[in-house]
């Protein structure tokens, strides 16, 4: 499906930008990518990996047929050709068909999802929503060799330090026996499995949900949901709060008050004139909130809480965070 490929590419880019050092974009034309020198680079990298403790069998198997992938560099250098409006994005990412499937998938996997939800304090509808948006409920995890993709990006050089570390992390995961090198597939950017974790995220946050001694984000749903829930819990999820809600603003609303960095008690927003979409009062809750206005300030407007900011640790896109919350609410029947 063409749009899913577009969304996957965008998601992969978001994974990089969320976890990698900033890389300045310029109008200068980048030099044409060449594979010349890759073999020498790989020999040097393998020596470095061995010196850092990666076993010889892992290095031999992981790099048995490694070649640079020009398509990865093409994706990495590409810029979006068009910009979706918020409404277009939400319709494509949270269509009724995905809501229906989300409800069915949650029901089908309820025992596994709810076990992770209970242990880590992240409600099951959110775990299901992340799963649905990231990988289409596990169907679209990416078909690139993670080792080859990361080696290509590290060799290309623009963010060599970051991708060298991620490649080393990927080898560490293989060396620990979590996944065979040939089965470590993911996005062109190196995001892996049904949770789309980068190798560093895997090492820091992934969990063995089925207690079998290894972490399989590709095939073991217990591990997938435990890992996603642990990540969200660790970076700040509050179990007793929702993510946010759509609201209406007074006509004289000061746009200087808009933005994720401006947080006020809900009661203060009520005094300013912020209301529910039906004109009713805001909920009486002792919570801080921010106002986010999409479509470059044209609306609609959302009141967002702590968990919205937590979602944005996963992906820095405001649209993505609203989509996750919207899908989660729909799955739960809100």
Label each PLM-derived region with a short phrase:
Residues 15-23:
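C-terminal segment of classical bacterial N-terminal signal peptides
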């Amino acid at each position: 499906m063409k749009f899913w490929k577009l969304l996957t590419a965008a998601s992969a880019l978001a994974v990089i930008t969320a976890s990698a050092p900033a890389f300045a974009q310029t109008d200068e034309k980048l030099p044409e990518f060449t594979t010349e020198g890759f073999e020498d680079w790989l020999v040097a990298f393998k020596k470095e990996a061995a010196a850092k403790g990666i076993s010889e069998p892992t290095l031999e198997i992981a790099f048995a047929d490694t070649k640079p992938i020009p398509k990865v560099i093409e994706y990495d250098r590409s810029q979006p050709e068009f910009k979706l409006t918020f409404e277009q994005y939400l319709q494509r990412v949270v269509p009724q068909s995905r809501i229906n499937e989300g409800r069915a998938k949650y029901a089908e996997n309820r025992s596994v999802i709810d076990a992770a939800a209970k242990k880590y304090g992240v409600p099951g509808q959110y775990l299901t929503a992340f799963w649905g948006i990231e990988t289409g409920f596990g169907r679209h995890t990416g078909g690139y060799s993670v080792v080859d993709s990361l080696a290509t990006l590290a060799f290309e050089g623009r963010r060599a330090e970051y991708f060298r570390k991620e490649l080393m992390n990927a080898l560490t995961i293989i060396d620990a026996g979590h996944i065979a090198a040939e089965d470590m597939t993911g996005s062109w950017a190196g995001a892996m499995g049904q949770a789309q974790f980068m190798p560093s995220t895997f090492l820091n946050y992934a969990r063995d949900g089925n207690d079998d001694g290894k972490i399989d984000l590709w095939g073991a749903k217990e591990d997938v949901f435990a890992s996603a829930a642990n990540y969200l819990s660790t970076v700040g999820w509050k179990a007793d709060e929702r993510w946010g809600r759509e609201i209406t603003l007074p006509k004289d609303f000061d746009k200087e008050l808009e933005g994720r960095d401006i947080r006020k008690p809900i009661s203060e927003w009520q005094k300013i004139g912020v209301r529910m979409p039906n004109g009713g009062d805001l909920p009486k809750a002792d919570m801080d909130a921010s106002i986010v206005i999409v479509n470059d300030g044209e609306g609609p407007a959302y009141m967002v809480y702590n968990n919205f900011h937590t979602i944005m640790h996963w992906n820095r896109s405001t649209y993505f965070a609203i989509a996750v919350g919207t899908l989660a609410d729909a799955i739960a029947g809100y």
